[in-house]
Design a protein with these regions (language model features):
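Conserved AdoMet/S-adenosylmethionine-binding subsite of the radical SAM
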Residues: 1-142, 146
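C-terminal accessory extensions appended to soluble enzyme cores
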Residues: 125-198
């Protein structure tokens, strides 16, 4: 990627991305490198329940700050938000504060909720029974077999999300973010040129 001047982006939850920090910086100097990271839960204890076997949110925040200091742009995916679990103002504000401090370029969020396909739903409910006894019944009663499972607080949370991001210069329009990810204007031997990656 670096040798031929291509841009690079990856979605990760792992601090291991920092093993290649110098290479990522080199790619970003020649073309463009953007690291995307998923943040779901501000509270690390809850994160360990919802996202076992991956780095907790505070560790990912450290990665985002390291990338910031290295001059590498970042984008955060705010998903999934689970109704009755992490769909709180406190959780959202905590994640947004991390993003503000890390100076992320954009946050992708398609709403405060999640999607459940047939097959996934059964697995999800099984995990709910284990970690949050009794909550499965609330989901079944409220959402039935819906594919889109939105928080009852979606409107309020999305208003906070957009307001806080606007105040801090963080892009929230997915189309704008995806366009940013797929184009770069640093082409070896050319000035002020723009190349579409895809």
């Amino acid at each position: 990627v670096h040798r031929y001047g291509f841009g690079f982006t990856v979605i990760t939850k792992s601090p291991l991305i920092l093993r290649d920090l110098e290479l990522l910086q080199a790619v970003n100097t020649k073309a463009k490198c953007v690291i995307q990271m998923t943040l779901t839960t501000y509270d690390d204890s809850l994160c360990e329940i919802l996202e076992p076997n991956v780095a907790v949110t505070s560790e990912r925040f450290t990665v985002l700050k390291t990338l910031r200091d290295a001059g590498i742009p970042t984008v955060v995916w705010l998903t999934p938000i689970l109704p009755f679990i992490n769909d709180t103002v406190e959780n959202l504000e905590g994640i947004l504060q991390y993003c503000i401090e890390a100076k992320v370029r954009g946050i992708i969020c398609f709403g405060m909720g999640l999607t459940l396909r047939d097959g996934n739903r059964e697995y999800f409910y099984k995990k709910l029974d284990t970690a949050f006894p009794g909550l499965k019944e609330q989901y079944i009663q409220r959402y039935g077999t819906r594919y889109s499972v939105m928080s009852p607080h979606n409107t309020r949370l999305m208003n906070i999300f957009h307001a806080r991001c606007k105040e801090n210069g963080i892009e929230t329009n997915p189309d704008v973010i995806f366009a940013y990810l797929s184009a770069f204007d640093k082409i070896p031997g050319k000035t002020n040129a723009q190349l579409e990656l895809f």
